[in-house]
Amino acid sequence: MATELVLLSDVEVTADRIVRAAADAHPEGTYVSYRGGDIGQLVDVDANPVLTIFASRPVAHPREAAAAVVDPPASFALWTEVNIPSGDPTPGRGIAEAIAAAVGGVIKERV
């Protein structure tokens, strides 16, 4: 079963930021984007997906967004969905945390 996470931040998660953050956390991987950049995926050397990142979206209803995650931060402007495919979530979680750190955000579990 996939692990569904959310990256909450005030800075947009872009392909450039993902690639820079992943270079340290997942140096042997490759970043691939789909649908004009709306979906990004980090894959391992065998092209197996490790982490999928969807385009950041502005938070229109902060209270509702905060209620959808475990232990939300006090404020955030952007919501970025992150999925780790089935299997060991450890590598994907580490990369997600590195991306969050690169944009000054946090990774949270969905409720």
What label would you give each PLM region?
Residues 1-111:
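Acidic (Asp/Glu-rich) sequence patches and key acidic residues
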